[in-house]
Regions:
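Ligand-binding pockets and gating/stacking loops
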Residues: 1-157
Length: 157
């Protein structure tokens, strides 16, 4: 609720919300181990099951945030319509510490939703291209961001 209220009242335009319980055992039913140890699961089914429970709980919180933003009516739409919400991880496979093929979700902000964009797994598109697209959507005149090579196609509604 605090994030929604801060955005709704224009108290801030940027929020970072960390849902990680990285070095502690999270308060998630069925989880007995701390998150970091579980990410090095070695393909052990019990560890993967606990990690899945943690990720499901995190996505539940993310979904609740999106719902709250979507239910907050503003002139011309909802708070979600004018808010970019990015959810992701710095690792594509924490078990091997791979930073390739990151799982990233983008919601709101006038982007085209309800689909899935996939990119060449061997010739990765830089994540910075997504950030470049997000900047352009905010009205920043930038051809690219940081180590990006441009922007992402297929995001615009």
């Amino acid at each position: 609720d605090l994030v929604r209220l801060a955005l709704q009242t224009d108290s801030t335009r940027v929020v970072t919300l960390t849902l990680s319980t990285f070095s502690v055992v999270p308060h998630v039913p069925g989880v007995k181990n701390e998150t970091h140890g579980l990410t090095h699961h070695g393909n052990e089914p019990d560890k993967i099951a606990e990690l899945r429970r943690i990720e499901e709980a995190q996505l539940q919180v993310f979904g609740e945030l999106l719902a709250a933003l979507g239910e907050t009516r503003e002139t011309g739409g909802s708070l979600l319509d004018r808010t970019q919400v990015l959810y992701g991880s710095c690792l594509g496979n924490a078990n091997s510490h791979s930073n390739q093929n990151l799982p990233i979700l983008l919601a709101g902000g006038g982007f085209r939703h309800g689909g899935h964009l996939a990119f060449d797994r061997t010739n990765n598109t830089p994540l910075a291209n997504l950030f470049g697209s997000m900047l352009q959507d905010l009205g920043v005149e930038a051809d690219r961001f940081a180590t990006g090579t441009g922007t992402l196609r297929g995001l615009r509604s």
